[in-house]
Every structure is written in C-alpha cells, then in structure tokens.
C-alpha cells in the first residue's frame, strides 16, 4: 500500500541562519517583542579558542497550523490514518509546538469527520516512526517536518521500489489547489539517448500518477465521478501491469538479475492495452 509523506515545506533548516564561529566567545539569541516590552535573551553556547559552528532556525505557528490542516484533510481525501513525527523529547519547545498544534487542529476541526470515516491521528517520535515505516505495509499518511520529509520521502521511494514510483503533490491548506508532479528529475541521460534515436527504458509511472492525481482533484472540484473513476482505474492498471511482469529496467533490476524488461514505448503500449481492456469491460 502507498506511504504518503506530508512534508512541511517551510522554515527549519531551509531558512536557517548559520555561520562559523571564528574563535573564543559567546553566542546569544535575543527575542525583541514588537510591543516594546523587555527583550528575552538566551545563551546558546560558549566557544573556546578553536571556535565552532552555530545555527538559528525558526517556524511560524500559522504555518504549522496550515500544515496540520493540509495533512489531515489529505488523509481524509485518501482515506488513510495520519501520523505526525517529531523529536519533542529533545526539542521540547520547537517540536513540542508541532505536536501541540497538530493535536489542537485535529481535536477542534477534524476529529469528528475522521471518527466517522474510521480514521485515526497519532503523534509518534521520529525514530519510532521510521522503524514502523520499515515494518508496516503502508496505507497511511506520514506528516513530517521539513528536513524529515525531505529525507524520508527518498528513503521510502528507494527503499520500497524506485524514485520512478514517487509522485509529489503540493496542496494549499484549504485543500482547493494542488500541483502534482513526478518527484524525480528530468532523466537527462535517457533523453540524450532518445535524441540519438536509441530506445530507452525510462520509467513513466511517476509522470502518469502526476496526471492521475491532478485529474482526480479536478474531478473532485467539479463533482465529476466519471473522471475520478477513470484516474483510479488507470492507477490500478499501471500497478497490475507491473505485477504481471511487464516493467522498465529500473524495476527489473530490483526484482533480480536477468529479469526481462521493456522499453519505454513497449511499457506504455502494455499499459494502454490493459487500460483499453479495463475500460471496455
């Protein structure tokens, strides 16, 4: 079953201020309230003559709250339970805020709807969640902080198959606007072979699923059940085609040495044939 990684794509290490401390001294962190009240100052560390490194990172409660809403809403959309992972035992204030805000949003805005759908929400420590991901069969949404989502999305994709099987969906907090794309890059090496007229065995699955995810959302917005059913059928056909032994080179290599594989065109034709058979059935 799929593992959906929800990545909070704001702040933390990705908007941090870091620098090399050149020598002996003290690094302080200061909060200056906008209302003119007394500043709050905290010591980060004392450095010896050899210096070191320091980093200051941040996030906003509003952004965390929006991420919680997007994660829980997408969990309902996909009919999956939702898990949030943090290290709140160490970062009691920073990660603790993620835990507290998610719980608040869940209880106040989503619990009744998720209960009615038989879905759950739970917070877990990141190390526990990573271990669970290794042994569970999938079928859940894993909400991650920015760095964790960056790393774990690739771990899940490669560990359970191939980057060519991972689709990325960007969603606004209100759930109305999405952008779906293949999570991998442009596969330039294969394109150069294609330009030379050579056959390639490039995995198109992530690109196909990017279209199906986008079209499924269009169907949801328009109340077009026929379109939603088509996207679901196409996704199922792609999976069944691979399970029947027809696949591209990257997947064949995972099955075992000497496993036969198809070219890009042959694989696309196999999917088209199977889809036509499904639609006409």
Tell where the protein language model's regions lie, with residue ranges:
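Internal helix-turn-beta structural module
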Residues: 196-202, 220-281
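N-terminal glycine-rich phosphate/adenylate-binding segment common to multiple enzyme folds
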Residues: 1-40, 53, 147, 151
């Amino acid at each position: 079953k799929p593992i959906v990684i929800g990545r909070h794509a704001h702040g933390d290490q990705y908007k941090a201020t870091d620098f090399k401390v050149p020598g002996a001294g003290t690094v302080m962190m200061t909060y200056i309230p906008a209302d003119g009240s007394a500043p709050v100052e905290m010591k980060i560390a004392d450095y010896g003559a050899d210096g070191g490194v320091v980093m200051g990172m941040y996030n906003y409660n509003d952004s965390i709250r929006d991420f919680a809403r997007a994660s829980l809403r997408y969990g309902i959309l996909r009919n999956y339970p939702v898990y949030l992972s943090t290290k709140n035992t160490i970062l009691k204030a920073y990660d603790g805020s993620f835990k507290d805000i998610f719980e608040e949003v869940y209880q106040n805005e989503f619990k009744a709807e998720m209960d009615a759908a038989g879905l759950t929400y739970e917070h877990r420590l990141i190390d526990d969640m990573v271990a669970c991901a290794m042994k569970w069969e999938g079928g859940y949404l894993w909400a991650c902080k920015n760095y964790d989502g960056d790393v774990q999305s690739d771990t899940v994709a490669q560990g359970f198959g191939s980057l060519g099987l991972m689709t990325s969906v960007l969603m606004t907090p209100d759930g109305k606007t999405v952008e779906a794309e293949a999570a991998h890059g442009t596969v330039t090496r294969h394109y150069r072979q294609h330009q030379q007229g050579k056959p390639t065995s490039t995995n198109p699955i992530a690109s196909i699923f990017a279209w199906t995810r986008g079209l499924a959302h269009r169907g949801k917005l328009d109340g077009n059940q026929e379109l939603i059913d088509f996207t679901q059928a196409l996704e199922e056909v792609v999976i069944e085609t691979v399970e029947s032994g027809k696949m591209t080179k990257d997947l064949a290599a995972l099955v075992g040495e000497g496993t036969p594989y198809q070219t890009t065109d042959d694989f696309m034709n196999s999917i088209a044939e199977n889809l036509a058979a499904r639609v006409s059935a």
